Amino acid sequence: MAILNILEFPDSRLRTLAKPVAMVDDGIRQLVDDMFETMYEAPGIGLAATQVNVHKRVVVMDLSEDRSAPMVFINPEIEKLTDEMDQYQEGCLSVPGFYENVDRPQKVRVKALDRDGKPYELVAEGLLAICIQHECDHLNGKLFVDYLSNLKRDRIKKKLEKQHKLNA
């Protein structure tokens, strides 16, 4: 396993549209393992392949405190099940140090393939629904900051650009 480099906003590669996985093979399973290791090390609760500069439709998540509930979503498709919205303060490994309120549908259904390429379906509410939507947004080149006002997004962008220059 390996720790992968996480791209940070405003890196343009985060805007790349991820391509579907044609076949779940050992290479995809290795990517999944590396993504989990990277996510846990960061630490975070979700990671999309786009964030590690692999533009395939792969997401890993684990909402548990003790790394006991790893979830894999390959080629996920989301269906909104309600018009009711929840507001959560979201953060992102690609937007480090920033947390903002985002409104998202309260309940969704996701269809995906698991680590072995087997199809499954899951109805999600609460934090799980929020995380699934957040991570799947990455696969479509979208970040949680895109839900914010231009003013807030530009402020975050400038602060991160300044931080990147200091770290260079």
Swiss-Prot record:
Binds 1 Fe(2+) ion. It is an enzyme of class 3 (hydrolase). It catalyses: N-terminal N-formyl-L-methionyl-[peptide] + H2O = N-terminal L-methionyl-[peptide] + formate. Keywords: Hydrolase, Iron, Metal-binding, Protein biosynthesis. Its cofactor is Fe(2+). Signal peptide: none annotated. It comes from the Bacteria. Fe cation binds at residues 92, 134, 138. One of its GO terms (biological process) is translation. The active site is at 135. GO terms for molecular function: metal ion binding; peptide deformylase activity. The keyword Protein biosynthesis applies. InterPro entries: Peptide_deformylase, Peptide_deformylase_sf. PANTHER family: PEPTIDE DEFORMYLASE. Removes the formyl group from the N-terminal Met of newly synthesized proteins. Requires at least a dipeptide for an efficient rate of reaction. N-terminal L-methionine is a prerequisite for activity but the enzyme has broad specificity at other positions. Belongs to the polypeptide deformylase family. This is Peptide deformylase 1.
